[in-house]
Swiss-Prot record:
Originating species: Agrostis stolonifera (Creeping bentgrass)
Family the UniProt entry places it in: Belongs to the universal ribosomal protein uS15 family.
GO cellular component: chloroplast; ribonucleoprotein complex; ribosome
Protein name as catalogued: Small ribosomal subunit protein uS15c
Keywords per UniProt: Chloroplast, Plastid, Ribonucleoprotein, Ribosomal protein
InterPro entries: Ribosomal_uS15, Ribosomal_uS15_bac-type, uS15_NS1_RNA-bd_sf
Keyword Chloroplast in annotation: yes
Subunit structure: Part of the 30S ribosomal subunit.
High-level lineage: Eukaryota, Viridiplantae, Streptophyta, Embryophyta, Tracheophyta
Gene from which this protein is expressed: rps15-A
GO biological process, one term: translation
CDD domains named among the record's database cross-references: Ribosomal_S15p_S13e
Length: 90
C-alpha cells in the first residue's frame, strides 16, 4: 500500500483476463436471465410480493432491449445466445 496525501491507495491484483467480458451484451443478458429465473421462482412462493414483481418486469424490459440491440447488430450472436439460454425469440 502506498500513501498519497494522507490517504491509503490499495493496489489491485491484476487477474488473468477471463474469456467473459462483463460489459458484453451476452454477459449482461446472461446475468439478467439468471436474476429473472431467481425472481420468478421467488414469486411462485410469494405471490403477493408486488415490489419483487415490479423488479422482475424491469429486468425483463432491460433484457428485451438488450436482445433487440443484439439482434439488430449481429443476428448470428443473437441466435446463438437465444439457443444457449433456452429463451424465446422476440
Amino acid at each position: 500500500m502506498k500513501k498519497k496525501g494522507g490517504r491509503k491507495i490499495v493496489g489491485f491484483m491484476v487477474k488473468e483476463e477471463k474469456e467473459e467480458n462483463r460489459g458484453s451484451v451476452e454477459f449482461q443478458v446472461f446475468s439478467f436471465t439468471n436474476k429473472i429465473r431467481r425472481l420468478a421462482s421467488h414469486l411462485e412462493l410469494h405471490k403477493k410480493d408486488f415490489s419483487s414483481e415490479r423488479g422482475l418486469r424491469i429486468l425483463l424490459g432491460k433484457r428485451r432491449r438488450l436482445l433487440a440491440y443484439l439482434a439488430k447488430k449481429n443476428r448470428v450472436r443473437y441466435k446463438k445466445l437465444i439457443s444457449q439460454l433456452n429463451i424465446r425469440e422476440q
